[in-house]
Amino acid sequence: KELYLITYHPLTLNVKNTQKEIKTLLKKLDTLKNASLIFTKANADENGLLINEILQDYCQKNSHKAKLFDNLGSQKYLSLMKIAKAMIGNSSSGISESPFFKTPCINIGDRQKGRLRTQNIIDCEINDLDQAFEKLESKEFK
């Protein structure tokens, strides 16, 4: 199985947009064959709690391939990042830590705007996930 490490925080204060964003991400993750999905919870603001509820429900329904963690701690988190096929989401750790392991990172949205990028980062909008995963699988990217 291929491991994906996913951390997704709310991009907007709009509840409907937040729901749509996380459901779009989960729909894309459902298309991945032979995947193990490790989610870490979103931050604890209002829409972060909404994301966490949606993730909890998703992981319960897909317990054969998806697990949700409150907090993995640095050592476990970095160990998983090292062996992951990709990091997915909009967490600063995707930008700042994934390059050390040469782990590809699909960075969604503008949350990390202004941070320095390395070649392992694939920036995309939530509606461009198909193209981001195509790039992840491309020979040029590997």
Q: Predicted segments — roles?
A:
Residues K1-K142:
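Nucleotide-activated sugar donor-binding and catalytic core shared by glycosyltransferases
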